Amino acid sequence: MSTGRTHRQTYRPNQDFLTPPVSLTVSPSAPASGSAVTLTATLTNTAPVGLLGTVLYLAVNGTGRPSALGRLAPGRAATRTWRTRLADDAEGEVSFTAHALFDVGPGSSDCTRVSSSVLLPYRSLPGAFDNAGIASDDALTVADIDGSASSLSAQALAAAGLTPGAAVTYNGVTFTWPDTRPGNLDNVICSGQTVLLSGSGSRLAFLGTSTWGAGKGDGKVVYADGSEQAFSVGVPDWYGANASASVVLPYRHIATGRDDNPVSLYTFGVDLDSGKELRSLVLPKVSDGLQSGVATLHVFAMTVA
């Protein structure tokens, strides 16, 4: 950085003062899609010289507005508030950011920032998809279902009737297989996400599988009247032709190519209070994302029956 004088201050490169703290609060702390939110950020100049030409940006998912603060003297703080509205179709992770840009002398610009995020309910199961677990036999590297570059074969699935968007019935329950191409997101890793539901029925059923051992965890169904129903799942590992499987595929992909050992998909679920309208589902928290060697539960489809 260069040195110079601005507003009678001298910038010295050996002074470590280019990270003034900025704080950010979001209200309400757990907003809903389509609701109003207020972002409040405070930039405090802890440097021994003034911050020049200071601009403070407040943003939601990277989109926001700047506020010009001008010169911020040493020891002074400036607060700006922005009231905005989340999109009606907002879902999943929503990030909030406060980002300050400033100069401390000619040619000596710097910045500081802080971020936070909230996880909104997903509007549908496909909206929650965060893993690509299906690959074509001629393009194995586009998917990874277990953190070790393994995947289900699109061709083996098609031979079993599981083509994109297909309606398939197991144990009297009909599911819609993900309408996605190999390599695209096609399943959700169960990590405690919330998915909105509607309607009513006697059973909430899932079609999925587990990698690196049995996928075990606790979930929750929330009804429209505010009542809750806890449930537990224990889904066997995908490797092998399991007697309890709804679908058995003759082979899978691994990092080095085709592996001619069978893998299994399963149906599982929870019995519901059929007289109640559904509001949402909290998926079982089995893992924190995809990790090789860690039991992970994947859901490809669900239905209220």
Can you annotate each of these PLM segments?
Residues M1-Q15, D88-L120:
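Terminal connector regions
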Residues S35-L39, S202:
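Structural beta-strand segments of beta-rich domains
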Residues S29-A36, G50:
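Short, solvent-exposed loop/linker segments at the N-terminal edge
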Residues Y11-A32:
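Low-complexity, acidic Ser/Thr/Pro/Gly-rich terminal tails and inter-domain linkers that flank the onset
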Residues R80-D89, A98, F268-D273:
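Short, hydrophobic beta-strand segments
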Residues L43-G50:
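Asparagine-centered strand-capping/turn motif at beta-strand->loop junctions
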Residues N14, C111-A305:
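N-terminal/edge-of-domain interface segments
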Residues T63-D89:
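Intrinsically disordered, low-complexity Pro/Gly/Ser/Thr-rich segments with frequent PxxP/GP/PP motifs
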